[in-house]
Design a protein with these regions (language model features):
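Acidic/polar low-complexity segments and flexible, solvent-exposed patches
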Residues: 38-74
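Short linear sequence elements within intrinsically disordered, low-complexity coil regions
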Residues: 9-12, 17-18, 27, 50, ...
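Short aromatic-glycine-(Arg/Gly/Cys) micro-motifs in beta-strand/loop hairpins
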Residues: 1-9, 28-50
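A short, charged, amphipathic alpha-helix used as a generic interaction element across diverse proteins
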Residues: 4, 14-34, 57, 61-67
Length: 76
């Protein structure tokens, strides 16, 4: 049976509290709710902006985060 996991910057966490602490420690990072490792991502949540979005997959969510990071990096 697969269990829900929380993905933040390459790491998986079993509970939201730990994932949120890590996301806040590393900066403005999304928390992805997944069903098992590298499976379908259900939701992504940004603790800083409190934005919640439905995602299609972990890879799609990672790609979106990388694009956001790149766009922020070039703006500065």
């Amino acid at each position: 049976m697969k269990e829900f996991m929380y993905y933040v910057n390459g790491l998986y966490f079993a509970n939201l509290k730990t994932a949120r602490k890590h996301a806040q420690r590393v900066g403005d990072s999304d928390i992805l709710l997944t069903l098992g490792d590298y499976d379908e991502t259900i939701l992504s949540y940004n603790p800083m902006s409190e934005r919640l979005e439905r995602q299609m997959s972990v890879n799609e969510a990672k790609e979106k985060l990388l694009q956001e990071y790149e766009s922020k990096r070039f703006i500065k």
